[in-house]
Amino acid sequence: MDFGAMMFSTDYSIRPDDLAKMLEDRGFESMWVPEHTHIPASRTSPWPGGPDLPKDYWHTYDPFVALTAAAGATKDIKLGTGICLMIERDPIVTAKEIASLDMLSGGRFIFGIGGGWNAEEMEDHGTNFKRRWRVLRENILAMKEIWTKDEPEFHGEYVNFDKMWAYPKPVQRPHPPILMGGDGPTTFDRVVEYCDGWMPIGGRGSGGVSLAEKIVLLKRQAEEAGRDPDSLNITSFGLRPDPDLIGRMREAGVDRVIFTLPSEERAAVTPLIDECAKLIS
């Protein structure tokens, strides 16, 4: 099982390049950053994590800028978005950013995506909350065309372009792995159709179904759709450094666990990184 760490990389926390180097030196397999372009001051959408939204959400760096800085300071650690809000992004521009990052990092990018929760933030980008999953699907399918074709074209309801030339292509073939966040009733449909793995938060099940049972259901659905179930990566996101919890994740069939780090300066975050690192071996 692989181990990674996630932080809201902000203008007041440890720099992303310094964090990546610390993680790589301690044997972590991957580093992850989330995304929010902004938080509307008039937000009414409830944050799933509780009543008070942490300021990290509106101080975080652009994920691709942060990960590019991390790539330049490291050699081997993988670099992921957890998650990238493709519902708020231009697919042509983002396909270019990801291909560039994958090229410059030597093929180390992992593309974590999701539907998000902040309706007001999405609407500022022109995306209707109720249509976000359809927008996400077309964005991802269009980006795959750009990454894998010499003259890609795409004609959908939300994304539409004629044949184009768009380089570089990603180092990873056919493209960087795409992991779907979330745990809704149709999440597995999305994973099986256009993703390479599943990234649930917290390692918990839902609806009375355990994580281990969920993984069995996902792999069964993948096999029924003609996909190799063992090709799907299961990444459990946002965990604490608890040996018993990590053991349960391993038994459930999780391939990677991601620890959550607070958005703090180096001195404050180093002890927690060291605590997490003890579980890697």
Where are these regions (language model features)?
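Active-site-adjacent structural elements that line small-molecule/cofactor binding pockets in enzymes
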Residues: 1-281
